[in-house]
Amino acid sequence: MPLVIPAIDIRDGRCVRLHQGDYDNETVYFEDPVKMAKLWRVQNAQTLHVVDLDAARGEGEHNRDVIGKMCDALDIPIQLGGGIRSMDQIEAALDRGVYRVILGTAAVRNPDFVERAVEQFSARRVVVSIDARDGEVRVQGWTEGSGLDAVAFAKDMEQRGVRRLVYTDISRDGTMDGPNIQAYRTLGRQLAHAKVTASGGVGEHDDLLDIQTLQPYGVDSVIVGTALYENRFPCQQFWAWQDKDAVDLDTFSTASLR
């Protein structure tokens, strides 16, 4: 089974989900990202995927403090994406406790920057996100097209030393309509060294089984957001939303750590 990575997207300090990347189609699921992160941890999360939606659109880094508190509160790695576009920002995120940073817009607009970042911080700490709609990479919080083909861009990133790519099919993101298996398979076939984390569309357990068939193509993990918030998996019945305030969020599970 692929590693399931819960997603926490933060906008204006709250946990939200966007439908197909549309900032005007937002659902607020939780007011406190730190408490949300702890809840995923007691559900045995082994790592978290955090996106700063405000920073992704260039609207400031006012969520960074709460992200630092999330890192302080947990004993598992956190990967952070959204608005990281300089070496100083990478260093600041890592110093804040983030385990791994995800480069998106910066990687598209300045591929040499990715190469330098991997060289300085290592491929384990720097990964690249490929956010695509109809095969075209999009940037600036998914609001602008780049004209780049997703597979060609992925191959370029691999040649520059990147060893993990987070591939999001924007048209599936937040829909729970099922992942774009063909897109992940097509991408994986073209890569020689980089692993792929799938993202977008997972809505039920069968979708995870579909992702599992992609392991021969280097797809070894999957980011899940809306489906977890909507309690689409049977094991989540143990932590029903109506009981969340009774859960001891300071007593972590025994999941394997980093």
Curated annotation (Swiss-Prot):
Chief place where the protein resides: cytoplasm
Pathway: Amino-acid biosynthesis; L-histidine biosynthesis; L-histidine from 5-phospho-alpha-D-ribose 1-diphosphate: step 4/9
Recorded catalytic activity of this chain's protein: 1-(5-phospho-beta-D-ribosyl)-5-[(5-phospho-beta-D-ribosylamino)methylideneamino]imidazole-4-carboxamide = 5-[(5-phospho-1-deoxy-D-ribulos-1-ylimino)methylamino]-1-(5-phospho-beta-D-ribosyl)imidazole-4-carboxamide
Presence of the UniProt keyword Calcium in the record: no
A single GO molecular function term of this UniProt record: 1-(5-phosphoribosyl)-5-[(5-phosphoribosylamino)methylideneamino]imidazole-4-carboxamide isomerase activity
One Pfam family from the record: His_biosynth
Positions of the catalytic residues: 9, 131
Enzyme class: isomerase
Keyword terms of this UniProt record: Amino-acid biosynthesis, Cytoplasm, Histidine biosynthesis, Isomerase
Enzyme Commission number(s) from the entry: 5.3.1.16
GO BP: L-histidine biosynthetic process; L-tryptophan biosynthetic process
Subcellular location: Cytoplasm
Annotated Gene Ontology cellular component terms: cytoplasm
Family per similarity comment: Belongs to the HisA/HisF family.
HAMAP family: HisA
PANTHER family: 1-(5-PHOSPHORIBOSYL)-5-[(5-PHOSPHORIBOSYLAMINO)METHYLIDENEAMINO] IMIDAZOLE-4-CARBOXAMIDE ISOMERASE
Protein name per its UniProtKB record: 1-(5-phosphoribosyl)-5-[(5-phosphoribosylamino)methylideneamino] imidazole-4-carboxamide isomerase
Source organism of the structure: Salinibacter ruber (strain DSM 13855 / M31)
Taxon lineage: Bacteria, Pseudomonadati, Rhodothermota, Rhodothermia, Rhodothermales
